[in-house]
Regions:
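Alpha-helix boundary/capping residues
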Residues: 20-23, 31-34, 51, 141
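A short helix-loop-beta-strand connector motif used in the catalytic cores of GNAT acetyltransferases and
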Residues: 36, 49-63
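Acyl-donor (CoA/ACP) binding surface of acyl/acetyltransferases
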Residues: 1-15, 21-26, 62-168
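Conserved GNAT-fold acetyl-CoA-binding loop/helix
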Residues: 28-49
Length: 168
């Protein structure tokens, strides 16, 4: 499947809201919930507008992962951009019906290609120790695991977060 990364805009709010609502339960199985308020339409739009302000000021870059017809398959972001050490944090999520098709692997590859345009030389990522698919996606795209781990609690279970770094 051919995908493309499209910069997030205000016009994406309604379709993105539907995507998030459709995938809420799936996402919350592997990452902490964004809370019930996030799924209230007006609050979602406010938060979306706030993210676009971050993007406008250069502290983050938000992309939608879309197919050839323009449907949202997922999201991918570079957040917490640091202009001094030219770094950012990677985050992504793929809708449940689109997993296992290589979309995340390709989206990360495409995003890495954008790094030079955003003056980013280092990208950091985290994933849980049990998320083997994400670990594979990161290593396939040139990320290396670093000896930094932290413990998080999700649904009452302790999990290790594994840190990865990609550098130009």
């Amino acid at each position: 499947m051919k995908i493309q990364l499209k910069a997030c805009t205000a016009g994406d709010a309604d379709e993105l809201y539907a995507f998030e609502c459709d995938n809420r339960r799936y996402f919350e199985q592997s990452i902490p919930s964004r809370g019930d308020d996030y799924y209230v339409p007006d609050i979602f739009r406010e938060r979306h507008a706030a993210l676009l302000e971050e993007q406008k000021h250069g502290s983050s870059v938000y992309f939608l992962i879309k197919n050839e017809t323009g449907s949202i398959l997922g999201r991918i972001n570079l957040v917490d951009r640091n202009s001094i050490d030219k770094s950012a944090q990677l985050g992504y999520r793929i809708g449940q019906s689109h997993t296992g098709k290589g979309i995340a692997k390709e989206a990360v590859r495409l995003l890495i290609m954008h790094c030079q345009k955003f003056y980013i030389d280092k990208v950091e990522a985290k994933t849980t120790d049990g998320n083997f698919a994400s670990q594979k996606i990161l290593t396939h795209n040139g990320f290396r695991r670093v000896n930094k781990e932290e413990v998080v609690v999700l649904h009452g279970h302790r999990m290790m977060l594994i840190h990865y770094i990609w550098a130009r």
